[in-house]
């Protein structure tokens, strides 16, 4: 895996190559570039994916005392410069979404579209900051015990996903010295909700309905405030990292969005209308299924009328 020196540290990245416009994906807190393996595996031929490890994650180590998500946006810009990529689809999950939004604000000319998964534009809720702080204190003081590991996995990956053990094993290997700064960057980030209208790039927002880290309402508000949020996809039962736990649904949403970027404006409008129509029909079917079979009221009435007419005819004879 190649490394590139940018802004004072070595950035670890992976470039699949391909003839199509690059799709650049940034991972979430405590994760790394490998979390997007399902999306890369499902991509059509020629699709180019660039994934990278942010500071304090994966094989990229932080060499500064402090950094912000704006700094990570600068890291991404330096990486794209190194690769000769002028414009790309910029995406991210959770923390990666924080970076993608700031990159779009700072370098709008480099963004052809955005893919935002399990993320938001606001700051962290105080009660969640306190919870994360307590978990961090235990991790730093005692190491990652099984109970804490399972709690973190439940927040990020849900309780039932079979791949959790792979990530727990990675967390056990993570140097404790990198935890504090990554956490500080998370909880001290600035609120950019009011600036979302400045982002003009077409955007896809994907969010799990069971996300324990970021409430889906925050993602819906983000989509509403973005200037060009073309589609909001709610992954039923999906948690925080639904691109891993519900990969097929997320892959389909991303593939359809990328295909739509190649269409003309009227074609894209028609595609959005068809998507909305299909979603309404799906929800209507789900409501019918949940309510059970409808009562048959018309047929029995018709049957009684027929029986009455038959009786009257017999009496007349």
Report the location of each language-model feature:
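Conserved alpha/beta-hydrolase catalytic His-Asp/Glu region
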Residues: 124-130, 144-197
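Gly/Ala-rich beta-loop-alpha elbow adjacent to hydrolase catalytic centers
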Residues: 92, 96, 100
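Conserved HGGG/HGGXW glycine-rich cap/lid loop of the alpha/beta-hydrolase fold
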Residues: 9-65
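Catalytic histidine neighborhood in serine/cysteine hydrolases
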Residues: 216, 220-241
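Catalytic histidine-centered segment of alpha/beta-hydrolase-like enzymes
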Residues: 238-251
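Short beta-strand/loop motif that positions the catalytic acidic residue
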Residues: 199, 205-207, 211
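Flexible "cap/lid" loop of the alpha/beta hydrolase fold
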Residues: 101-106, 111-142
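Conserved acidic catalytic loop of the alpha/beta-hydrolase fold
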Residues: 70-88
